[in-house]
Structure formats: C-alpha cells, structure tokens
Regions:
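Glycoside hydrolase catalytic-domain context in secreted enzymes
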Residues: 13-503, 518, 528-543, 547, ...
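Bacterial Sec-dependent N-terminal signal peptides
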Residues: 1-17
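Short, surface-exposed beta-strand/strand-loop-strand elements in extracellular ectodomains
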Residues: 508, 512-522
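Solvent-exposed serine/threonine-rich low-complexity stretches and specific carbohydrate-binding patches
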Residues: 524-526
C-alpha cells in the first residue's frame, strides 16, 4: 500500500506545474531548512528529496575550475570580434560541456560539487571603462550597445531555447556601476540617473528583457551611498518592477558581510542579512549568511514571508533546471561526455581567437614576405612564445598550441625560426642557488635560514628558526606563524648564480623591509601597502674564489 501511494505521488508530482511543485515542496520544509537553501552551498534535505547542490560555477570563457574543458578567448577578446552569432555558438558549446559534466557528476556520486553545477556566474556585463580595474578583461566592451548585444547572445546560448527547462542558468553580473579597483569592496559609485540609464543599465536591461537571464549578481560597491546588495531601488524597483525580472538575485562573494565590515551600512551580520533579503537579494555565496538569516529571524528583523519569497525564486530555478524531475521531459539530460573539448569546440575556439585579434598598426611589415628570400631568420624572444596563458576563470584544455609551434608550422621551410628564453618576468630564485651556512644547515643546506620573532622589532632570541626554500608565502597563512601576536623575521642565505652576468633582483612584500647584500643595504622601505623594489647586481663566477666572495643575502 505504501509503495502504491508513493508511485502515485511521484507521478502526480512529475506532471504538475513548476509552481505547484514549488508550493508542495515549500510546505515540507522547516524555517531552518528554508534558510539553508538560500546559501550557495545548499545541503541535502533527505525527507524532501532535495540533493545537496552548490550554486557556484564559472564559465567566463569556458567551463572553469572543473578540469578538462574547451577554453575560448577572454570576453574582452570576444568583444573584439563584434560577432553576435559567434558569441552564441560559443556559449552554446559551453553549456553543452556544462551539462555533460553535471550529469557525469550525478552518475558518479549522486550530486554536484562547486564548479560542477548548472548555475553559472557569467556573463560580466560591466563596462570596460578603466584598464586599471582588475576585472576589465572579463568585460565585453566599453560600449553599452555592443556589450548589450553580446551579453544577450551569450545568455541565450547558455540557457537554451526550451520554454520550460533551462539548459543552464546565466547570471548577469555585477549589478551595477562596478568598475573600481581601489575601493572595490566598500566604495560607492556616484552616478546620475541619465548616466545609469544610458551607460550602465542597458546591458543588464537587455539581459533581463530580451535574453530572459534567470539570475543577476549584485555588486560589492554601493550606488549613491546604498550598497548594491541592499539597494531596493536596484533590486526591486528597477529589476523586478520596471524590467519584470522573476529570477534569483545572488550577492557577489561576501558582499552582504561587507554591508557592516566595509560600508558600515549595518551594525551586525544579522542586520546586513535582513537588509539584503528585504531589498530583494535572495541568496549569498557565503556560509555566514546562513547564520545571519537565522539570527535575523530570531530577532524578528525578517519574517517567514520574507524567507518564502526568496525561497520560491530559488526553488523555481532548481526545477527549471530539471532537478527533482523524474518526468524524463528535460531535453538536456542526454548530452554525452564526448562533447567536452571535442574537435568542433576546439575549432570554434580557434575561429574565435583569430577573429579576436585586432591589428592596430602595420608599417608594411605584415604579413611577413617569406617567399622573396629576404627574410631568412625569425627571432622569437621570451617565454610567452612557449607558454599558453588561459586567463582567470579558466578550464584546463588537454589540447593547446604555443605561439612557437604555430609560427614554426606557418613558416615551414621558408625561414629559420629561433626562440630565445630571455626571461623578462619575475621568477622566484630556485633554492639550489641559495645556500645556508653549515652551522644553520642542520635541517637542509638549500634556501634561506628563517628566524621568526613574536615581536615587531627582531628583539631577543628567535621564537622559531627553520629552513625556507623560498620567500614566496604569506606569513598570516603559515601554520607555524598564525598564532603570533606580532611578527618580525630575518632570512639569510648565500646566493651563487648559475652563470656570470648582470642580474635584476626584485623583492616584493609589505611592512618594514631591509635587504642587505654583503652587509651593504640595498632596500630600506616602510609601507603598509605592497612594496616592489628592483636593483641590478653584477655576479662574476670567475671572481668568487679569488677576490670577491659569493653574495651574502640578508632580508629582515
């Protein structure tokens, strides 16, 4: 009898509308469980047949951080193509690979972890107005119209064309006027209404009204003094009432925490959570939001109606993605694993790369005239010709080609191609060129002798003495140093270069920094911000055992 009732229940549940499914599921959940589902890392709720799910996945220019994937040019390169059809074909390929990866995860373990899901935090629809902003390369363009057109195409390819089911969820970010690096977590953009509507809004408006984006991410910054993730004018008046948005608003990273830690717009986490929820922000990326909402509910800063309003939007997207749906009607469940970095997608990436290149100036040099015998040798200088740079938010392609390989193949036998690895980028000094003195080398002769003091002035005996193979680490994240109330340190070693020559040594860090070479001070800086200092040093191996010793390096 129980089996019969269960079978009828499932069949009815599968045939009912998404609205009915949401209403049915909502009634089964406690307030605590509802709050749990408003955080990106949503837990399993067994009695309601809800699987665990992490909303955080990235696909800026290909499925990112989930292993093998086709990697396309960064959005600033895609914007240079001015090709709407190409952008849609690219995002369609991305969503194919995303679906294949998601269903493989379900088959293997019954759920998807972070970066294995179907809810993607792309595209970035901010305006590329300032090259100093760290996320400029994530944007399509400095032009609102071009950004709008490419954004619509990207979203349509991600979400698919089925009237009921979403292929994946596209999240238009970061809403809005998010363009500043210096105060990125706590600054306020002062923007008049005309500039908003002519410059900052158009791409987001097109994403909602034309492409029907299912999700929007609120920005870290404030707009005219009110943080974007607690801004009812943006999230309710503009998004929902004016543009008709019915999807989920999620905060950028720890933006809700920043309401009280940076913006000082709220006094506590629970007050920040309440302000965000009531303004129209449905979900946060951070687990702290869960505790903030619980305390806000206990203190009656929010009520069940506020929670249910956000929950309905969240559950609606899960059902539109085909989760908890045994009907078999979802058209996107049978995309094979073989689409991931398939030959068609690699060819599409090549097409996009070729179309993204803009030649700004050519003094009759290109194309190289290889057939007239005037060019006999081509010199390529630097590691960029032998390294493949994918950019941030990237997958890991199994197939890639270096510039050296491309140029060599293109030139063929027409000229000689020579590559020189003239290192022009900073490189951590390998530990085999650094030698500790014998009395310090009880645990290894390579690298630096590090002496650490639980005070700020290198006074007294060191509290810790150890071997450090390099100085490329953050002391606050070091397990041996994390409990130090204050910290000062001294590192010593002898530097012996692989070859004679002029070397440029660079040191970067923050605080009070002194660097000595053979007892001569070469860096003496004090700053709370990052310090980066370089100096030239002549190292002649032929003199080491005659009149000039190896270079003794002391850093404090």
């Amino acid at each position: 009898l129980i089996i019969s009732i269960s079978a009828i229940s499932i069949n009815t549940y599968a045939q009912s509308s998404i609205e009915e499914k949401v209403a049915t599921l909502e009634k089964q959940l406690t307030t605590k469980e509802k709050i749990d589902l408003l955080c990106a890392k949503a837990p399993k709720i067994a009695h309601a047949n809800i699987t665990r799910y992490d909303w955080w996945s990235e696909c800026l220019h290909g499925v990112a951080r989930a292993g093998k994937a086709t990697v396309f040019p960064k959005p600033i390169g895609l914007g240079s193509t001015w090709d709407v059809d190409l952008i849609k074909r690219i995002s369609t390929a991305i969503s194919d690979e995303a679906r294949a990866k998601y269903h493989k995860a379900l088959r293997n373990k019954g759920y998807s972890d972070r970066h294995e899901g179907l809810t993607f935090f792309s595209p970035t629809l901010n305006i590329a107005r300032d090259p100093r902003w760290g996320r400029t390369s994530e944007c399509f363009s400095e032009d609102p119209y071009l950004t709008s057109q490419l954004g619509v195409a990207f979203i349509q390819g991600l979400q698919g064309e089925d009237p009921t089911y979403l292929k994946t969820v596209a999240t238009a970010k970061h809403f809005v006027a998010n363009n500043e690096e210096n105060r990125r977590l706590g600054g306020s953009a002062t923007v008049d209404d005309m500039s908003l509507r002519e410059y900052y809004f158009p791409a987001f408006q097109a994403a909602i009204t034309t492409a029907k984006a299912a999700s929007v991410m609120g920005a870290y910054n404030a707009l005219n003094g009110i943080p974007c993730c607690a801004n009812s004018y943006l999230l309710t008046d503009i998004l929902r009432k004016e543009w008709g948005f019915k999807g989920v608003v999620i905060s950028d990273g720890s933006a809700i925490d920043k309401l009280y830690t940076h913006h000082k717009y709220a006094k506590t986490l629970e007050e920040a959570a309440a302000l965000a929820l009531k303004a129209g922000c449905d979900m946060s990326l951070r687990d702290e939001y869960r505790e903030g909402l619980r305390k806000a509910y206990e203190k009656r800063l929010i009520n069940t109606g506020d929670i249910d309003k956000a929950l309905k939007r969240v559950l609606t997207l899960r059902f539109r993605l085909g989760m908890n749906d045994p009907s078999g009607k979802n058209p996107y469940t049978h995309i094979p694993d073989s689409v991931v970095e398939c030959s068609q997608h690699r060819q599409l990436a090549l097409e996009a790369s070729q179309k993204s290149i803009i030649l700004l100036k050519n003094d009759k040099i290109l194309p190289l005239k290889l057939n007239n015998q005037k060019i006999k040798k081509i010199g390529l200088i630097g590691e960029a010709f032998t390294s493949v740079y994918y950019g941030d938010y990237s997958g890991t392609p199994e197939h890639n080609t270096t510039l050296l390989e491309c140029i060599t193949a293109e030139v063929g036998q027409k000229a000689e191609v020579t590559w020189i690895n003239e290192q022009v980028n900073d490189e951590i000094i390998p530990s085999n060129y650094l030698t500790r003195s014998e009395k310090e080398a009880y645990d290894g002769i390579l690298g630096f002798t590090g002496e650490y003091f639980n005070n700020s002035k290198l006074t007294g005996e060191p509290d810790l003495r150890r071997q450090d193979l390099s100085l490329s680490f953050i002391p606050s994240k070091d397990k041996q140093l994390k409990d130090y109330q204050q910290l000062s340190a001294r590192w010593q070693s002898t530097l012996t270069p692989p070859n004679s020559g002029n070397y440029t040594l660079t040191f970067s860090g923050s605080g009070n920094i002194k660097l000595f070479i053979n007892d001569s001070i070469v860096i003496n800086k004090t700053s709370n911000k990052k310090i980066k200092e370089s100096f030239n040093l002549l190292l002649n191996l032929s003199l080491i055992h005659i009149s000039e010793p190896t270079r003794r390096v002391v850093i404090s």
